[in-house]
Each structure stands twice: as C-alpha cells, then as structure tokens.
Amino acid sequence: MAHYLVIVESPAKVKTIKKFLGSNYTVAASQGHVRDLPKSQLGIDVENDYEPKYITIRGKGEILAALRKEAKKSDKVYLATDPDREGEAISWHLAAALKLDEKKMRRITFNEITKNAVKASLKAPRDIDMDLVDAQQARRELDRMVGYKISPLLWAKVKRGLSAGRVQSVALRIVADREAEIDAFIPEEYWSLDAQLKVKGEKRPLTAKFYGTEKKKMTIHSKEEMDEILKKLENEEFQVTDIKNSERTRKAPLPFTTSTLQQEAAKALNFGTQKTMRIAQQLYEGVDIKGNGTVGVITYLRTDSTRISEEADAAARSYIAETYGEAYVAEGTKAKSADKKIQDAHEAIRPTDITRTPAAIKDSLSRDQFRLYQLIWKRFTASRMQPAKYETTAVKIGAGEYCFTVSTARIAFDGFRSVYVEAEEEKEESNVLVGHLSMDSVLTKEEFDPKQHFTQPPAHYTEASLVKTMEELGIGRPSTYAPTISLILGRRYITKEGKNLYLTEIGEVVNNIMKQSFPSIVDVHFTANMEGLLDMVEEGKVPWKEVIRNFYPDLEEAVKIAEKELEEVKIEDEVTDVICEECGRNMVIKYGPHGKFLACPGFPECRNTKPYLEKIGVTCPKCGKEIHQQTIDQIIDRLMALEEKTRVQLLAPVIRGKKGEHVKVFEDARKQGYVRVRVDGEIHDLSEEFKLA
C-alpha cells in the first residue's frame, strides 16, 4: 500500500487532520517556519542582486531530520501549510530543506479543517505557487532591510532595544498624528435646547429638539444666542407643522474579515487584537467537540475577503428557512468584494457548519472560545438574512420663527436583527407619544432644557479603530494588524489605558526621528503603494527583486545621512529606591516585551535584574503576604517558568491604573489551587493552554 506524508504547520492541526485520513497517511508538523534570514546579519547579498541567505532556524534541525526521515519512506509528500503568502513560503522552504523530489511533492490548501475540505484538497493538488512565494520573499527582505538598517541607528542615537519597521513605524506615526491633533484641538462652545411639550390628554410630556428655522438648521454658539432664542420663544405657541411617515431598511452586515472580526471582538467582547487571533486560531485548528472528536469549527482566520462558497451559502439559506422561516432568507447572493487588495480566493471567516450552533457546542468550548465562535456564527448567519425594516415618523413643531423636531422609529420586520446586532449599533428612537400627534396639533410647553456643550477632540485610537484605519489606508495585511499593534505596545512606543492607546515619550522620540530622517518609510501613501507592489508580485506582474532594487539604495543613502546629521537624544531611566544586592546601586526601571522590570544601572559590569512589583498596600487574607500588581504577560512568563506539573491559582480582581489594566496576584501563588485569572470581570482558565495542571 502506498504511503503518504502530509506536512502542516502546527501540532494542533495534526491532531485534527489525522482522524480524517487513513492509516497510510502520516501527518506531521513543521511548527512554523523552518528557514529564515540569519538574525546576526542583514542576510541579504546586496552585491548579488539581493539574493537572500537563508539558514535553518535554530531548534528546527531535529524537526527537519524527523520530517526528512518520514519523507524518504513516503511515496508522496503533501505540503499543507496555510493558504496564504506565508504558508506558501513555508512549503517552499520545506521543499528545499527536505530536498524533496519534485515528482513526489505536491502542494495542497484548504480554507477549513474539515473532513470534506481536506479530502477535496488531496484530489486537487498543485505545484508551489512561486508568485506567492516571491511576494513573501519581497516582504521579508523589505522588513529586514528597514529593521536591520534603522534599528542600530536608534540604538546609537537614543537607546538600545529600540526598533523600526516598515509597517510598525507607520502605525506609530498614525497614533502620533492623532495625539498631535488632540493636543492642537481648540474646543468650541455650542448649545442644545430641548423642549418638554405636553400632548393634550397625555400625562407624560415628549421631548422635542431645537432644529432652527423651518427651512434651515441652526447652531447655537453662545449663551447670549441661547438667551435671545429663549426670550423669543417665551410666549410662542407650539404647533405641529409637518408629519412625515416613511420606511427604511438596514442591510445585514457582511461576514467577518480579519480586520472586522478584530474590530467587533474589541467592541463586543473587549478582546485585544492578539487575543482575538489566538482564540480564532484555536477554533480554526480544531477543538474537541463531545461526540465528534477534534473539529475545526471556523474557516481560515487571515483573510480580507467577504466571499462565501456556494455550498456554505446554500447551507446557510436552508438553515435560516428551516429555523426562522422563508421570509428571513436574503434574496440573491451577497458578499462579493471588489477590493483590489484581496490576496486570494479565501472566504470570509465563517463557521464550517452552520448547524453547529453556539449553544450546541458551548460545553465543549472555553468561555472565550464560545464568545468568539458565537460572534462569528451570528454574523455569518445574519449576512444571509433579509434586511431589517423600520417605520419612521418625523415631526416638525413650529414655535414662532423657530422649529423643533421629534422622531421615532419602530421595527416593522426584524430580519437579520433576530440573530445579530452590532455592538455599537445606534439605539432606535422610541417615542410612543408621536403617534398621538396630527397636523396642527397644539402642544403645551412645560419647560425648556438648555445645555452648554463643547466640541470634543478626535478620539484616541483603540486597537479596534487603529486596525480599521490601517485597513482603510492600505497599511499592512490581515496577518500583520495584530502583530504590529502588539509590537509597538511591547516596545513601549504606545501604552494602553483602558481601551485607549497613548503615545509615550520614547514613542514620540522615535516617531520624530523617523519623520525627520526616513520620511518615506513613515509615509502612509508610500507604504500603501508598497503593499500594492507586493500584490502585483503575487499576481506575477512585477519581479520581486525589482521591488527591492528600487527600494534599498534610497534607504541606504538615508541611513548614511542620518548617521552623520542626527543628534543624540538622551532619555533617562527612572530610578527606584530598590537597592541592587549585587553592587549596591539604586535599580532603574527598564521595559521589555512584557512590560516593566528592574535592572542594575551598572550594566554590563552588573547584570542583576528582577521583576518589577508594584505594591498596592493590600495583604493576602489567607497568608498575610503583600499582594503585588502585575500584568497578564508578566504572570504568564512566570507561569511558564514553573515546573510542568505545578498547580497554581492566581486570584485577580482588576486594578485600573495609569499604565493600563493589571491584576493582583499572590506572590506565593504556587501554593494555591489552579491557574485562574480574572481580567475585565472575565475568568480565564490558563491550565490547559500552559499545561500547568
């Protein structure tokens, strides 16, 4: 019997896919990339037409040896990495590293990890798409060139540990520009005026809002203007001058793309972008469903397409007709996108089986998995449903030369809203008293309610709104939104307070240097155009090295000028009262990928470091020890350092402080029960994920 090897990226996929295939199939994981540019050097032969110098990633030797051994025993090797540029490149690197015979090597892809999808992919194998690979190679070299050439300059001129990046630096500038807008904002005064009007025969008054004159909307700019209007209204009669009844519809939303999922999960579930992607990855790769084993319950999570397969569309319409009735099924086919940036034939993010309702598998999912799956399921189901229909009434009420308005809207047919309502959807106005009004009705004024307001500055970016802006501007791609935001947070270029993102001092310094010395790198249009060029490489329209040839010389010249002309910027470390037990110096606060830590200023002579523990003046009621404040990432780092069998409980009510959301934890936590933390009022059980129980 012939033997086949299927290589995927992650061990989680191995478990899911194994059960779909027979005993003559071996499924193994590469565990991500196996080759990359070396970390210790540029890794690009500039003198040899920018040829990349790939090496085996440290720690991947044993994995490759095992795969090589298995490949030799197999009649055919199927490379089943993710269906995008990165996945295509991993397959290409695997083929090279394993020295696979082209005759026995085939590439397969699937948008969902289900039995039907995997079986179908095996019936339609193909060659590796070198246009996709070349687009990834171009992106990798561009990113390496920017990071490798500019980051050392930041170390020399500002401080070590800083970095620049082709996408991260533009994202930082977007946040910095918004901060500048907020700082420069000058509030302007304006006033609103509500009138409480009594309808004859009714006990409760209705609230009418000042509009202006019958034909022109007015803005009231000052108290003086308001006083003048109130004086004129003093003895005026309030009479209905116009009533308009109309119908309107609200279309169902499109199914999720990566960016819209990240945005809505942030609004509805309070998930950060990284958390959303981590949980979506779990749902895609497979979860244990009682009675069904490991099942991939959503389609591929990195996509900018709203397209839905004909099979999924038909299944959804059938389910909706059976569950909600034929009247709820949308007409025609929805969700084709004309966006030229769409990288491939991916579908939107959807459940792999619409009949697998959230309620049906709730007991098989963690709380976070359930909430995200429910969001995806509802959004997809709603996208195949009829619009919601509203009956609206708008009334104009005249008072002398002025006009007030009152309106109401009633849902006539709920349509898709029977399943899904967006987190920030506007509340429909509801004023039942409007139904008691008719033309020329006279109302009695009970009181006026004038209020002073001031225009508000632009809102600070949140993770959700930053993702939305990046997508709208063409900055980055579905796979890069979350890592980019995580990176500039980790570098402390921005901080997160509540949901809002704020520019830090070090972020401002780095952004100013980038704008001064590398204006094109942080230019939104330049970066968007570069993404467009990468798309053209993927489409086979532009050779990938042509993109590099047109980029690198200008970058190298800009670096040389900056090295000569850029002045050093000194940023002092914050000194603490904690004494270094090694040398007696006062330790300083440093920032790492997961937040603050204490370091000796005597580095490199003294390399002492320790965790940064913020005292909050609260003792543990069980053991009497002091409770400290730490970030989730700091906690996870410490959990990972424990022995595998350790059982830990972290009792963690949220503290909201200047530096973001933290949790209280017991310093002596390992003596407690199991791994559990509470963030934003939500309990997270980490024991499975970190294998500590």
Role assignments for model-derived ranges:
Residues M277-Q281, I485-S486, F666:
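Short, hydrophobic-biased segments on the C-terminal half of alpha helices
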Residues A2, I506, V522, L613-A693:
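Conserved phosphate-binding elements of NTP-dependent enzyme cores
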Residues R139-I150, V167, A195-L197, R248-T260, ...:
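Core structural elements
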Residues A2-L5, T16, Y25, S151, ...:
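Basic, low-complexity terminal or inter-domain segments flanking catalytic cores
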Residues I113, A117-A195, N245-S246:
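C-terminal or mid-to-C-terminal helical accessory/interaction module adjacent to the motor/catalytic core
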Residues K215-L254, S441:
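Metal- or metallocofactor-binding catalytic centers and their adjacent structured scaffolds
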Residues M1-Q137, Y211-E214, I220-K223, D227, ...:
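Intrinsically disordered, low-complexity regulatory segments
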Residues T260-G272, V467-R477:
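Short helix-coil junctions and helix-kink-helix linkers
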